[in-house]
Structures are given as structure tokens and as C-alpha cells.
């Protein structure tokens, strides 16, 4: 019974999800239905948390909109998500960046992660 559930979950998982970590700036394009119209809405911000649970994986994105902090939790493999684009890689040392909720302005900035190349 468990193998059947795992197989069905594996089929429903998206394969085109880019690799991103907490601290990265991402743009998530989501399908929004307004009346009879269906359109794409972009949500761009910093990933502050990732929850890895297979098909039930989720991530939280935080942005500042009109001086107010807005957080949105996305299900990674949801059909509502059209695309996820990594805009900037952030250098952080923690898995959950909830401390950004209390910070504003320059103290809420995250350093950019530099890719190390092997010169041997």
C-alpha cells in the first residue's frame, strides 16, 4: 500500500523546480483566477524557510510591499505555481530566517553568496 502512494506522489512531483536555499531571492509566478479570467501574478522576495516533505514540500517567501512585510507560503509542487526563478543567491548560516521579521532597512539585507571555482 505504501509503495503505491509513493509512486503516485512521485508522478505528481514537478521536475523543473530549481535548487534554491534560504536567503536566496526568488520570483514565483502564480496562476490567479479573478472571475472568469486567469492570469499570472509574480511574487518576488527572500526565501526565509524551506520545508522538505516530498510532495508536500513548501517554502516561505518574504518581501516588503509599501513598507509592510508580506510573507507567503508556497507549496513547491503545486499546479498553481507556473515557475520559480532564482534572482540572487544569498549567503546565510541558518536554515530559518525568521529573525528578518524584526529587522527593517539595511539590517534586513543579506550578503550575496559567491560561487567558489576550483582553479586546480
Curated annotation (Swiss-Prot):
It holds the Pfam family Ribosomal_L19. This is Large ribosomal subunit protein bL19. HAMAP family: Ribosomal_bL19. InterPro entries: Ribosomal_bL19, Ribosomal_bL19_CS, Ribosomal_bL19_sf, Translation_prot_SH3-like_sf. PROSITE patterns: RIBOSOMAL_L19. One of its GO terms (biological process) is translation. Keywords: Ribonucleoprotein, Ribosomal protein. This protein is located at the 30S-50S ribosomal subunit interface and may play a role in the structure and function of the aminoacyl-tRNA binding site. One of its GO terms (cellular component) is cytosolic large ribosomal subunit. GO terms for molecular function: structural constituent of ribosome. It comes from the Bacteria. Belongs to the bacterial ribosomal protein bL19 family.
Amino acid at each position: 500500500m505504501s509503495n503505491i502512494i509513493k509512486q503516485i506522489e512521485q508522478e505528481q512531483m514537478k521536475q523543473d523546480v530549481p535548487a534554491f536555499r534560504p536567503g536566496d531571492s526568488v520570483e514565483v509566478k502564480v496562476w490567479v483566477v479573478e472571475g472568469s479570467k486567469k492570469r499570472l501574478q509574480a511574487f518576488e522576495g527572500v526565501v526565509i524557510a524551506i520545508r522538505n516533505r516530498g510532495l508536500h514540500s513548501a517554502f516561505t517567501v518574504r518581501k516588503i510591499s509599501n513598507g509592510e512585510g508580506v510573507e507567503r507560503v508556497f507549496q513547491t509542487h503545486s499546479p498553481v505555481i507556473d515557475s520559480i526563478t532564482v534572482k540572487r543567491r544569498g549567503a546565510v548560516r541558518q536554515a530559518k530566517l525568521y529573525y528578518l521579521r524584526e529587522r527593517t532597512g539595511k539590517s534586513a539585507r543579506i550578503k550575496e553568496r559567491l560561487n567558489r571555482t576550483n582553479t586546480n
